Amino acid sequence: MIQLQNTFIFIALTIFTSASTTSLKNETKPLNTISTLAAQTNISNPEEDLFDTNGAPKSDTVNASTTTDRHKIPRWVNEQKMQKRLHAEPAGNTVQFRCAVQGARPITVDWYKDGEPIKKNGRLGGYKFRQRNQQISLESVIMSDRAKYMCVAHNKYGSINHTYELDVVARIPIPPVLSADGMKNQTVKVGSTVTFRCRIVYSDAHPHVEWLKYNVNVTVLKRAGINTTDAEMEKLTLKNVSFADAGEYTCLAGNSIGVSHVSAWLTVLPVVDENDVWTEEIPQDTHYLIYIFGVVCFIILLAFIVYMCNSRYQNKDPPRLIPIENPDNIPPMSKMEEPVMLFGNEQAWRRMCLPHADHIEINIQPDLQWELKREDILLHERIDEGFFGQVFRADLIRCAGGRKEKVDAAVKMLKSTRTEKDMLDLLTEMDQMKRVGKHKNIVNLLGVCTQNGILWLVTEYAQKGNLRDYLRRNRPSELQYELSTPDSPAPPRDEPLTLRALMSASHQVARGMEYLSQKKCIHRDLAARNVLVANDFVMKIADFGLARDIRSNDYYRKETRGHLPYKWMALEAMTDNMFTHATDVWSFGILLWEIFSLGGSPYPGVKTHDLVRFLRNGDRLEQPQFASSELYRLMRDCWEESPRRRPQFRQLVEDLDRMLASSSSLEYIDLNSPCEADYLPSDVDSNEDTESRDSANATGEDSDSVFEPIDGHGAHAYEVDEAGPLLNPQPDANIVCNGHARMQSDV
C-alpha cells in the first residue's frame, strides 16, 4: 500500500506475489489510480538514506500492522565488515570505526572509550562523528589513543553494542630504505632502450619520489603527481637514447624523516659499422713494456706509503701503558693473540693481548675530563667481588670552591683471573657510564684512573649495599635467612619495611630506567642484585657491564659467547638473542616480583633448560605475597610475549607514581603473617637444590648463580639452576653481606 501524507510518499513493506493496482490518496481527497507496482522488500543503507527502514521520515510513525517487532529492534548493517575487532595502526594515521545500524527510529548511537563516554573534544585533535554518530574518526592517532572503543545503539525496543580495540604502533623514525638492485651502471649503444628501477623496501610514512639526472646541471626527469602510482615512479625508461642521455641518474625518495637516494651511470656508445672495424696487432715488445711500467709504478707507490706512515708515527708521542698486574702469579695463556681495535667514542687506539708475562698491556689515551690522580684516592676494605672483578670502598679527595673535600666512593677493578674479554667489558662499561651522564637513580661515574697502574672505575658509593640483600636482611624475623657464616653474627637490620617503601623503590628504579631509555641505552642485566641502596633509601641502578648503546638501531643482537642473566631475560632474548627496551621492561617485571617477594628467587623449581617451554605455555611467576592485584597486573603486562604489547618505562613511571601516591607510609609488612611461598628458603633442601649446589660447586659458582653462558646463536653451553636457597649457607669469607656493584661476569 502506498500513501501520500504531508508531501511524503509512504511505501508499506508488503510483498506481492503478482502485480497489483496501487492507489494514491491525499489527506483531503482521493487521487486516481496512476500505476501498477510490484513491491519488493528492500533495506536501505542507513549511511546514505535520510529515512528509516520503513520509508518514513524521522518525525513520522510507522503503522504497527506493517512491521514486526523484530524489525524495530536495532540491528547491524553489513555485520560481516565488523568482524575485525583488533586494529593495529601506526602512530599518525587516521582511524575510523563504523557501527551502521538500522531499526525503528529514533535510534541513538553512543560511543565509549574504555567504558567512559567519549566527548567530542576529549583528545588532542578531537573526535569526529559522521552519519548520525554511526562513524567515529580519530585523526593522527597517538599512543594514548590505545583503548577499547564500544558503540551502543538503542531505541525504545532494545539495544545492541559492538567493541573495537585499537593498538597504536610507534613509527620507526628512518628515511625511506631503497634497494639498489635495479640501479646498476649500464652501457648501451645509441638508439637502445634503458630502464632503471628504484624499489622502495620500507618507508613508514608515504614517500615522495623524484628522478634526477646529473650532468653539468641537475635536471628533474620525473616527479610524483596526484594521479601517479608507486609502480610508475619506481621505474624510469629512456627510449632511443642518444649521447645527450649519458650521465648519472639518481632516484630520490623522501618522507617526513629524511631523504635517501641511489644512483647509477649510463654510458652511451656509438653504433660501429662492422665494415669499419679494423684491428691492429700490438707488438709483443709493447706488452713487456706495459708490464714493466706497471710493476715500477706499484713499487714507487708502496715505498711512498711506507715513508708517509713512518713519518706520522715518529711525529706522535708514544702511548702510555697500563699494566694489569697478576698478583697471584697465575700462569698466562699459552696462545698469544694481538687484535687491533677501536673502542667506543674514545679518540685513541689500543692493542689488546695476553702476553707470556704476568700482565696485560693496553695502550690508551687519557680522557682529561674524567681522569683522576691515584694519590687522591685512598682504598679501604673490599666490599664485593666476583669471578673477574672486585669493588673497594674508598675516599676520594676533590677540590671544591678552593678547598679539598673527602667523598665516599667505590672503586671497581679487575682481578687476576681476568681475560681480554673482561677488560673489554670493563672499558665498555666505562664508555657507557661516560655517555649516559648523571641521574639521581643511577650509579654515577666520578672518574677513572687509566695511567700509571691498573684500570680503576671510581663511582658513587651506596652505603646499604644492593637491593636484593637489603630486602632479605630486613625481612620479618621468621622469614629471615641470615646472610652470615656460622661463626659470624647476623648483619644488623636497617628498619622495618613498609609497603610504601617497596613501592617507592619500584618507582625510583622505573625512573632510572626511563632515563636510560631516553639515552638509547639498554641495560640487559636489570635485577635487584644490580640496584644499590644509598642513604635516605635512594635507589641507584648499577652494573653497566652488559649495557649497550643502540643510538644507531633500536635493538642490539648478541653475536658472541658470554654469560647472561637467563631467568631475568625476556622470551625473545632467550631464543633470538635480541635485546630492546622491551626486554628491559620484562626484566623490570622480574625486579618488581623480587621486591614484593622480599628478595625471592624467580622461577623456583624450574630448570633453566625448561624455562623457554614454561614461558611459551603461558605460565608466569605467581603473585608475590606482598603485591596487590593491581601491581601484579602491572607485572603481567611486563611479561607479555609480544614486545609491542608491553608498557614503556614512561607509562610504568606514571602507573607507579599513582600507586605510590595512594599507598600509606604507615602500612608495615605484617610480621606475623604466615609465608609459605616457594621462593623463600627452606630448612630442608630438596634433591633439586642439592643437585644445583653440587653443579655450582663443580663449576666454581655458588648456588645463587644467575648467569647462563650463551653462544652467539642462543645455544646453552651449560646450565646452572637457581632452585636452591636464596644464598649459599657458607659463602666466601671475602664476600660481605652488603654486596656492591658487580662486574658483568660476576655472580
UniProtKB/Swiss-Prot annotation:
SMART domains per record: IG (SM00409), IGc2 (SM00408), TyrKc (SM00219)
Signal peptide: 1-24
Positions in the Cytoplasmic compartment: 310-747
The enzyme's E.C. designation: 2.7.10.1
EC class name: transferase
Region (Disordered): 47-68, 679-731
Gene3D superfamilies in UniProt: Immunoglobulins, Phosphorylase Kinase, domain 1, Transferase(Phosphotransferase) domain 1
Skewed-composition ranges (Basic and acidic residues): 710-719
GO molecular function, one term: fibroblast growth factor binding
Entry-annotated residues carrying Phosphotyrosine: 556
Catalysed reactions listed for this entry: L-tyrosyl-[protein] + ATP = O-phospho-L-tyrosyl-[protein] + ADP + H(+)
Residues annotated as domain Protein kinase: 377-660
Positions bearing carbohydrate: 26, 42, 63, 161, 185, 217, 227, 240
GO BP of this protein: fibroblast growth factor receptor signaling pathway; positive regulation of cell population proliferation; positive regulation of MAPK cascade
Bilayer-crossing regions: 289-309
Active site (catalytic residues): 525
Segments on the Extracellular side according to the record's topology features: 25-288
Annotated S-S bridges: 99-151, 198-251
InterPro entries documented for this protein: FGF_rcpt_fam (IPR016248), Ig-like_dom (IPR007110), Ig-like_dom_sf (IPR036179), Ig-like_fold (IPR013783), Ig_I-set (IPR013098), Ig_sub (IPR003599), Ig_sub2 (IPR003598), Kinase-like_dom_sf (IPR011009)
GO CC, one annotated term: plasma membrane
Protein name: Fibroblast growth factor receptor
Record organism: Ciona intestinalis
Classification of source organism: Eukaryota, Metazoa, Chordata, Tunicata, Ascidiacea
Gene coding for it: FGFR
